Amino acid sequence: GVKYEHRTSRAGDPHVHSHVLLANKQLCRDGRVRSLDGVSLYHEARAAGMVYQATVREILSQKLGVEFGDVVNGCAEIVGLDDPELIASYSTRAREIDQWQADNGLETRAAYERIAQKITRRTKDTDTPLEELETEWARAEHGAQVREFVAGLVPNNEAPARAVGEDFLPKPSQILSAVVAERSTFTRADVAEKAAELIRPGAVSPEDMTVTVEGLVDAALGTRGTWSVTPEKSRELDNTQREGSQKYTTVEVVDEVERGVDMATARVERGVTAESIQPVEGELSPAQADAMRAVVGSDYLASVVVAPAGAGKTSSLKAAHKAWNQAGKHVVGLAPTGKAADVMVGENVADESMTIARAFVGTDELTPEHTAAKLGWNRDTVVVVDEAGMVSNPDTIRVLETATAAGARVVFVGDPEQYSAVKARSGMLATLSHELPDAVELREVFRQRDAGEREASKWLRGGEEADVSRAAEWYMRHERLHAGSVTAMMDDALAGWREDTAAGKQS
């Protein structure tokens, strides 16, 4: 491969970083030339980036004597250069991206940020000499502060190397705790990411960083509390395994899931009469009515409604809400995001609603009984959790614990095939949809008028390679796909979105 060292961002700000290009073809031991497996390589890219960042921190600590703050997502600010105003003054690209989102009336979201990065991307200036750029940076608003900081640095390159030992390296339990805080199952690369994040400057020499990380990963995966959840195959017998195909979990994660299943499947006999839920032409299909009668009349503490996009979730929950109200029940809506929570009352699927974070704020030290009392939950409460696939496992457990203490019922609504919780272990919805005997799924798609398009949406949802290809072929045949430059397509999409929203449509 070839490594390129860059010192600036596309906007000409100081931004030291590296690019590595690997040849797609490699000469193998048997003399044959083969292509690299791009999927496996891509899977390892983030872990490699974390090791790179840890190595850079170590080099800067030795060569310049700088200290670093807490590591967040693999990166850490230099202590003394972590003033937000200083960072912002040298972050022209970030300001350009924020300004583009503001100019287009878009809220700050990662998806919009990625679009803005592409649309506002400029050609990098490679003509201006580094000396001229450094002079320009020194004259900037915070240039004097930076010069003063640099002048006070004392290099550590002559200091004796610190011995590597248990006192200076993260323990396997620390690494695994950091991993499972974000995911229920994980790969070797996931463990490598966290191991590199947790290595403090001064503990490992730059030359030994990679081998040290590999050793920490071996130790973490070799603990008694780590379980393999996929069959292990010998590379000598089967060399077709891709990186990341081997998945692991921990005893703590399994125990948490089992506890959630035990609570959800407890028989509480809080079901109510659901005779009022009947099919209505154009509003509620027979299958939707059957599903809601099963949910409303269920004797289990929890119910699950698997609801793919466009399957009539709102109209179904409206019917259930009416039946609960007729039985004297109060329906509380919970959701992982404010946007999802806000529409629950407006769409008449709940009597009140809030985010899960707001519901449980300030309750960390309370017992489930006290939390239930604080929220006003009791035997006449039905808690409907929307977008449940995006709810973390710990939050799901808290909802179940509180409902159990209150004698309330819980209904989890969502699609296990859609996005999971952000940076938090999840997957409980999928598990409960299999474990609850009366879990229901809304299988009909109503959002699209064209029957073929409804079927294509199901193929995309499943995510299997063959099904995705079938969906893409359908979209291509029916002129749903348009080609062009990334910028042009994004501009067209944004223009279409503006036109729809200006007309009061959902887009």
Model-derived features with residue positions:
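Conserved RecA-like ASCE P-loop NTPase motor core of nucleic-acid helicases/translocases
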Residues: S303-N348, V411-V413, H478-V486, A493-S507
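Conserved helicase motor core of P-loop NTPases
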Residues: R259, R267-E275, D290-A291, A405, ...
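Hydrophobic residues in beta-strands of the RecA-like P-loop NTPase core, especially within AAA+ ATPase
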Residues: V385, V413-G414
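Conserved P-loop NTPase motor core of helicases/translocases
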Residues: H330-T402, T431-H434, R443-F446, E453-A483
